[in-house]
């Protein structure tokens, strides 16, 4: 008997985005996403803030961008639906560093983010997309539970190796319209799907192609069949789902987690409340 992951509300697909470097063009990007109910994770380097008081460029109508200052960063991301995550303190090539400095880069960035936003920061994206097994081990020891690579699969698979997490595609991928159509097509009775889009918002300014993300948000947003989530929300939900406990015949399922979890056995989705045991 199949027991298929379903996202909150019984949905069979989820969408998440990831954007790097903490630049001023993240602000109009968030405005576009917010208008369509889409959530993203923004990965920042807390040693690279711009000086306070610098003029704010118009990154929508010009190609000019810059990093946000510390005060601007808090004002931009705090009290929004979006997540702020680690991108390492100084945006280094982590795989070229000894383990002690990798740990320093990750932990200091994490501590700064937590102090700025009052959160427990557990997510990350690799600067330059580069890493090795030593880096992965340092992340695990530093309390990081997922880290996005720059690998684009062109698929909607649910992550398995969260510290080497790939994306579906970059927003400049020529396959983007086709992938959106594939994702929006109904596939009843099939495994859950995750669309993961990544990039840098300054690319929209530098290339003056803001229409790409506007069109994407208009097409993919506001859909009752899609769960819109940050990276950490996807991680927490999928990890909780994988902790479900099954009886020997698979028909009795216990949810030991704090989340309400949904699954399907081929028909309608079933919700298993936190701490509950259900018969299917």
Language-model-derived ranges and their functions:
Residues 1-9, 35, 46, 114, ...:
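C-terminal domain-boundary segment and adjacent tail
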Residues 34-145, 152-165, 169, 192-201:
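Metal-dependent polysaccharide deacetylase catalytic core of the NodB/CE4 family, i.e.
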